[in-house]
């Protein structure tokens, strides 16, 4: 009885080896495919979370080669006062005080406040971008002096010809001076270079 059993085992051994090999191959292939799938998904997830790592881009600095002088010349010829002020980075408002009236310091302060407010309201309506640039730059205000009413009127006309806001304040005449007297000229806000074309020769007050 033992001999047939031995013969059976011997004859069945090659088949068992073959079956084991096939099963092992299929199991190994299954885990290989699963690992590959997980690796591919992880790679895609990394690409999605870090898109900049996939294709780095180099930026050229050739566009920065244009000189500031050329830019300013272009703006002066073709652009608004706001664009010029933004390019220069300097803006101001000037208050030209008439000195021949003998106004007190308090009176002068009040008249300068009237001029500054008047210019601010007009400029805000006409060129709000320019006003915002001036505000963001610190709202510079400079007080200058002139001797006569005629000088104030001349400066006003010159400023307006350059596109600047210019307003002469006339006093109501309730306190120190005659009614209707021109007291202060406000100019701006505007680019420093443009305002200096009008008031560059005046002395500080």
Swiss-Prot record:
Q: What is its EC number?
A: 3.1.1.29
Q: Which reaction does it catalyse?
A: an N-acyl-L-alpha-aminoacyl-tRNA + H2O = an N-acyl-L-amino acid + a tRNA + H(+)
Residue ranges of region Disordered?
40-68
Q: Which GO terms describe its cellular component?
A: cytosol; mitochondrial matrix; mitochondrion
Mark out the compositionally biased spans (Polar residues): 40-49
What Gene Ontology molecular function terms does this protein carry?
Answer: peptidyl-tRNA hydrolase activity
Give the GO biological process terms. Answer: mitochondrial translation
Name the Pfam families on file. Answer: PTH2
Gene3D superfamilies xref list: Bit1
Q: Which UniProt keywords apply?
A: Hydrolase, Phosphoprotein
- Name positions with the PTM Phosphoserine: 65, 79
Q: Which InterPro entries match?
A: Pep_tRNA_hydro_II_dom_sf, PTH2
> Its family?
Belongs to the PTH2 family.
What the protein does? The natural substrate for this enzyme may be peptidyl-tRNAs which drop off the ribosome during protein synthesis.
Protein's recorded name: Probable peptidyl-tRNA hydrolase 2
Organism encoding this protein? Schizosaccharomyces pombe (strain 972 / ATCC 24843)
